[in-house]
Amino acid sequence: MPSPIGHALGGIAAGWGSVPRRNVAAAVMLAAVAIVPDLDLLIHDHRGVSHSVGAALIAGAVTWVVTRSSRWALAVTLAWASHVLLDWMSNDARPPLGVMALWPFTRDYYKSSIEVFPAVSRRYWLAQFWIDNLRAVAVEVLILAPITALVVWWRRPAGAQGSSRGQP
């Protein structure tokens, strides 16, 4: 499963086009939303209901109720769903394998046959802990940072686009 860094980058990339105001606060909010599904680690139910499309839709609905902003609701839904997608595409060696992606329709676990992201170790007592995790984070950053940068650049505010269009 990706690290919080990978999930933060994925959340920003997924939700950036939908937020009403694109600024640092919006990026921080999207990053935080994309990390929230892993709070289930605290109750030892990792990759369950919080790692599903249903949970992403609930998060978006709650956001809409609180903000009455369909754009924020969509951004939150996409940021949360990015977590599910990244975990689905990750190396997973601990049962149950995969994520409960389609809850509430089914409680089955799903795992991609293509593992894009290496597993992040939580076994800090092992000698390889730091090396393995630095390698995993490096892969995440190499894949997700360019995608995130491209999305942020593409969806930059209109005033910031002038210089790239030959305007003074």
Which role does the model predict for each range below?
Residues 1-168:
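N-terminal membrane-targeting hydrophobic helices
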